[in-house]
From Swiss-Prot:
GO terms for biological process: positive regulation of GTPase activity; signal transduction. GTPase activator for the Rho-type GTPases by converting them to an inactive GDP-bound state. It comes from Mus musculus. It is found in: Nucleus. GO terms for molecular function: GTPase activator activity. The modification Phosphoserine is found at residues 284, 315, 317, 338-339, 481, 581, 655, 819, 840. The record marks 87 as: Arginine finger. This is Rho GTPase-activating protein 11A.
Amino acid sequence: MWDQRLVRLALLQQLRAVYGIKVKGGRGQCDRRRHETAATEIKGKVFGVPFNSLPHSVVPEFGHIPSFLVDACASLKEHIHTEGLFRKSGSVVRLKALKSKLDQGEACLSSALPCDVAGLLKQFFRELPEPVLPADLHEALFKAQQLGAEERNKATLLLSCLMANPTVDILRYFFNFLKSVSLRASENKMDSSNLAVIFAPNLLQTSEGHEKMSANTEKKLRLQAAVVQTFIDCASDIGRVPDFILEKIPAMLGIDGLCTTPSLEGFEGDFETPGECKRKRRQSVGDFVNGALNKLKSSRTPSITPQQDRTAQASASPLILTPSVKRKLPGESSHAFSSKKRKSIKHNLNFELLPSHFFSSNSTPVSVHLDTSPDGSSQTSLSPIAMSGNHLVSTELRRSKRIASKKVYRVESGKAGCFSPKVSRKEKTRRSLRLKFSLGKNRDSDGCSVINRYENVGRRLANQQNLKSRIDSVKTGLLFSPDIDERLLKKGSEKISKSEEHLLTPDQLDGTGYRMSWTEPSNSSFQDMSANGTSPIMQNLEVKSFSLEPDITVEKSPVVSCELRPSTFHSQPDSSVLSLSGDEGNLASETLQKIQKAFSESGSDLHMVINHEQSSVTNTGEEVEFRDVTVTESKGHDGSCAGEEENCPSERNFSPDQSPEFAREADEECYSTQMKVECEGLHSETPKADPLILQAFPGEEPAEEPQSPRNQLSTPSRGNENGGESAGASGAPGEDESTCSVAVLSKPRPQRLSRQQSLVEKCDSVAPGALQVTEHGKVSDHIQWFNKLSLNEPNRGKVKSPLKFQRTPVRQSVRRINSLLEYGRQPVRQKLAIFGDAASPLVKSVSCDSALPSCVQNTSKGPTAPLITSGLEAQKSTSCNKSSVELTSKSFTKMKRHPDPLSASLGTPRLCKQENKSNGHIKFPLDDLTNHERLKFVVNNNVAFSPGMKNRVVRKPSEKERVWYKGSPKNPIGKTQLLPTSKPVDL
């Protein structure tokens, strides 16, 4: 059967859950055991001695019972019909004589009177060192008696199962005897309630016998009698564990019903040394908890499952996240877990029990064909980076210990925090790596939010420990990984995927991005065309004069990137395919030679690109300038552009700043473009599409939105592209409509991409030279903002120290309040007269958001212009007139002092002094300077204006105003100076 402590745990759980009874555990049995071992030295005595030191007799149905109890009950059974048995007390003298004889070992009970024997029996229980019913169960037994009749019996019997086995045997024997007495109640007048009242003080041993009776004591005696009466009525079931408790133990441990009894070798010697009882009991409870957790973690696998089968099962289907089947821990370590290990087990357990469909190996297949359908090929497999930005990095140290023991050799794939298992190339499970790299699938199709991807960019950038080493590893290993070789072997084409380039970019186009530019159901025809070296359109395309590659890289997801080679490469035999899929070293050398050849033909410098790609993260502004979207347009007919590559206007460079909205959104993502590898050199014969187009826009606009004017502008060229590319795919020899701008969408494209296409079309008609317009201020602001997301930026050491919070002096605050009140109290006529001449020194902000001064007058409008204009318009007009483009983001909270004769004048001499002392600060009433830097404002004194204006501007305060000021701490503000809050302040 189950171990006693497992049964005890199940009983305690049942009592707490069903009846609300909590048992104070555990030390009572150890204390009793210690007393019992100490009492073994006492020999010969019967009264006042623990049970284990008494001589025992074996009773067939009940086990080992003390001999005195057996003899006394046997003697009383002969006189069971005696009226008032146990109620009538015997002679005290005879009781003492009988007691002394029994202690000396004489057998005198057979000749004694029944009342004397009954008195001896009560005295025997009363003089025990500890009560028969354990003291730590008294409160629980009392609570059980306050339940209903049915529940009271069940709870009392469950509590009796918590007692030690010798005690249970004695209680069962004695209460069966009392039950037989109560069954003769018609003769002896002693039913179970009467017997309970008599034996309750003896069995429960209350020490309150000499105290006065009170309501409390009476209630306690009643509860004690109810406990004994329940035991008498249910005597045959005392200590018997119900079957439903035993059935709960496997479910509690997470063991299958068919499983054999779990081995409990660690529990065998616990009671051998009573001094260590407390420590071992605490250990055993931890063992039960850990055993239950381990069984639950192993997905309810039977505990007799061999360890080898389990590890083989776990390693046969390698998953991206932790598998649902854990390896079994060794037997010697399964019973001693530290608290830290328990916490980690609980964390993993909660992580596995999440109801996600991609955590289980049953719902997510190991191998899924990506190219079967272009739309729904990888709906069920999402990248772990897309799911959680920093979970894998945070749990990698803990998981690596389990990975090391699983004998699965892993090769680094360049993905942040994820390792792909190294499987032999002959297995078809290699194709499941496409699902890991399928970052192009938008989660909007599942109804999930895309906003988390923007947050994950910063998290993942912050988790990258060494940016340069990651770039180098991606450069050297990604395009030559076995995934590419498998793909080349399977497809038989020179198509090299760009998926590894975009491993670190979570943003994609919308859900149907896997579709090719033309409307075929799959990309097989394009593969055949690229594999066929004699295709007519391929013969017409020379180095850097074909336009299909940028269209495809802009249009579709980065996963299924199809790249075309020039005709010189296609004229080689098909052995080049085998060499690409063969040795990695040969592939690297061939590719390097082709890169150098292509760059030498195009006249560009390879080393410049390489050095530029290895630049630091902080050079993102130059990175954006360098990676302008280069769009190649082969406008010549057939091969006419082959010789005049340098002269024909086939390349247009436009920076992202040509559309400010595009630049604003793209620059926020330009950290992820740093992770673009230089393995775009494999596409060396083709101009590179700007990665910002591929990354910065995950397709947030709905697909059904009406076309903007930019979309409508680009519609005719889209039709030409569709016609040209479909004709090229079918191999039409007379094809000459190859004019392509950026991309061809088979569905309405996002608005920003259409803007890019129209911008490129406008670039064709502007000038043959390359257009580059950059706004360094906006780009640098975005870069600085984005750098705050990165923990590894080089400027971390230059972070400003925390702001010192300075409390504004009381005197200064009072001055501000009084100046506001003083200004509000001026007559309206006086204010209107001043408005034509001078601006008030007290500026009221237009809104809480902008905090722009509203009373700054534009000099170009003359003195009669209305003063209350919006602060933003005044600021724009003054900056345009003075030709100063020095506006920063901080100029919206405190306006710079531009050389304005009206704003240069101040109202009162007192305020004039205050301004001169503070180096040109405009003092706003109640302005909080706590968390703002003190800016040095630019004051230009070169503007000449007439002295008459100077004389008009300065206003002398009246006598009333001087009298009103009582703002110092010595002269507090009078009651008359405080305005009610409901009264508006006149401007």
